[in-house]
Amino acid sequence: MRGGGLLVAGTTSDAGKSVVTAGICRWLVRRGVKVAPFKAQNMSLNSFVTREGAEIGRAQAMQAQAARVEPTALMNPVLLKPGSDRSSQVVLMGKPVGEMSARGYHGGRQEALLGTVTDCLEELRSTYDAVICEGAGSPAEINLRRTDIVNMGIARAARFPVLVVGDIDRGGVFASFFGTTALLSAEDQSLVAGYLVNKFRGDVSLLEPGLDMLYGLTGRRTYGVLPYAHGLGIDEEDGLRVSLRGAVRESVVAPPHGEDVLRVAVCAVPLMSNFTDVDALAAEPGVVVRFVDRAEELADADLVIVPGTRGTVKALAWLRERGLAEALVRRAAEGRPVLGICGGFQVLGERIEDEVESRAGVVDGLGVLPVRIRFDRDKTLARPVGSALGEPVEGYEIHHGVADVRGGEPFLDGCRVGAVWGTHWHGSLESDAFRRRFLAEVARAAGRRFVPAPDTSFGVLREEQLDRLGDLVEEHADADALWGLIEGGAPAGLPFVPPGAPPLGAGGAESRGAAPDPAPQSPEGLEVAGSAGSRGQGLEVGGSAEATPHGLGQEAEQHVDQEAL
């Protein structure tokens, strides 16, 4: 028997699709429903390695944990990992299949993947009672409707009802709900069952007249109003859509266990990947994690982390341009703690030979670790288990770089010299005993009277956060009505909201016979890079995309119709 399902779409990127999907999964599994998450196509630099060695989006791994099932490649068959302004690495069924430009991806290749993603969805439906799908960006991107495989494309194929999530904290949620619906075709509108308001602050009764008017305009009900929830700490889907400059993560669990706090600075390098590595540190009472992009911000840090990146050579150049490279070398010489993870580990080495990622050839590293890196075309995808500092450690590896360690003390797969550590392993800090031992060493080297809490369990904290998501759905949504959608599909007779989607090819470059722009404004997963305002666009990570007044003027001259203005 095929299981039921639901597509969680959003009015915009960051509307809350990932956490709502996770919350529904946790709510369902607590009701005894065997449920799985699914996202046909994801654009993310935060990824995860499954037990079978497949790379998928980190958000889908988190949703699988919410559903209490083991994540597999079926749950995220297509993953796009941006590596430059106009290209992404395409990961299909957990394995990289090559780099592709945005133009090439839109030129028929994306449509060709529809069969693959629907096959994966059908396999999940044959195994689970319910599959909760997450969309990408907005389903109303009219310029991308023809090639859509992640929003209404997958909903049509599966005949799944669609729940549209809107972030009211941004403002304009009613216009967003109405406009999203009104820009869909009649066929697609017949699947849009209704709406879910996310991140509401205040008295819900003040919102109810607007919800009634929305029903009058669209003929669709609102299935819930989720309150703004602080301190969830759930995995970010990717690091492209937001500048992390100045962002702070710290424990909301308890005050410091010792006399001092421990200050951690994370270099917000370009194309930062798996920055969720620091979440386990931020969960420790007394540890404050800050993302930085200026050399002076390293001065008072007790530990500096150079995180993973999809562009190691680009990150190295960025560190040098910012003066951060010199500051890191100086820290190492002074015996002040530095940790390099994956691409950050590679940066700390002596030399990088890269004919794969950047094709820059041989580039000098910072030289603080006795390591030489050679990029291989085959990607390492692994779930290693080992020990370090006398404690057991588990992690996962996602990298093209092969490390030739030529000295220092062994540290996981990498090495340690003084107070500088380097490893390719992501997720190692989630191993509680190892994390406590590592933080104690950092505190000693930094001269801090910081004591790791003896009972902090990152796994337990994560389960508590997922339960909070399940509680939000159970307490603030019409749970019975949601289950009715999952089992029975969208209500019959939903009215059409004009004007509907324009005919394919109406207006724009396509109807004029010209090639479409290679990087149109679009939701996540459908472009490699473009203008800011939608996930995967702008590539501003940690302040790496700077705009001077002169630069803004040049952009305006090139992209604005000056005569019309």
Residue ranges and their predicted role:
Residues V356-A382:
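Conserved P-loop NTPase catalytic core
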Residues L526-A529, S534, L539-V541:
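Long, intrinsically disordered low-complexity tandem-repeat segments
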Residues A506, P518-A519, A529, G542, ...:
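Short, low-complexity intrinsically disordered segments enriched in A/P/G/S/L with frequent Arg
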Residues A532-R535, A545-A547, A556:
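Short linear motifs in low-complexity or flexible loops
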Residues G349-V356:
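Extracellular/periplasmic helix-exit of transmembrane alpha-helices
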Residues C342-G343:
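Catalytic nucleophile serine of serine hydrolases
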Residues M1-R330, P337, D354, R377-D378, ...:
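Flexible phosphate-sensing "switch/lid" loops adjacent to ATP/NTP-binding sites
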